[in-house]
Amino acid sequence: MADQLTEEQIAEFKEAFSLFDKDGDGTITTKELGTVMRSLGQNPTEAELQDMINEVDADGNGTIDFPEFLTMMARKMKDTDSEEEIREAFRVFDKDGNGYISAAELRHVMTNLGEKLTDEEVDEMIREADIDGDGQVNYEEFVQIMTAK
């Protein structure tokens, strides 16, 4: 399944994996998974975290290594983001709930994810998504970015 991923996707997932793998030991524990999910505004229970890990933990050792993570991501991409998941993600970014993602809101979420971006990088991300040129990202623009293949 993971063999259907492009090199670019694998590189992106490697970066994401590193964000989860706080201690850099090459595996993701339930604790690390919980930390990242909470930084994204989710509040999973210990049992839910364990379920998520068990779903992809092929060798049954209780943690996720990179190949297992790739399998999980490939599976998720196959179920391509449902409308509801995209809406949920938009709400995480749109802190003040005004229907737009501003540069400040984007910076805030990326910082919570451990991504220290320069103002230029944040502005560049907004510009890439901002189809109507109003300096922020509305829901339609967000959907375009999230569903772009």
From Swiss-Prot:
- Residues where N-acetylalanine is found: A2
* Annotated positions of the N6,N6,N6-trimethyllysine modification: K116
Name the positions where Ca(2+) 1 binds: D21, D23, D25, T27, E32
Q: Where does Ca(2+) 2 bind?
A: D57, D59, N61, T63, E68
**Pfam families registered for this protein in UniProt:** EF-hand_7 (PF13499)
Tell me which residues bind Ca(2+) 3: D94, D96, N98, Y100, E105
Report whether Acetylation shows up as a keyword of the record: yes
Q: Which GO terms describe its molecular function?
A: calcium ion binding
PANTHER family per the UniProt record, alphabetical: CALMODULIN LIKE 3 (PTHR23048:SF0), MYOSIN LIGHT CHAIN 1, 3 (PTHR23048)
Protein name as catalogued: Calmodulin
Say which species the protein is native to. Epinephelus akaara
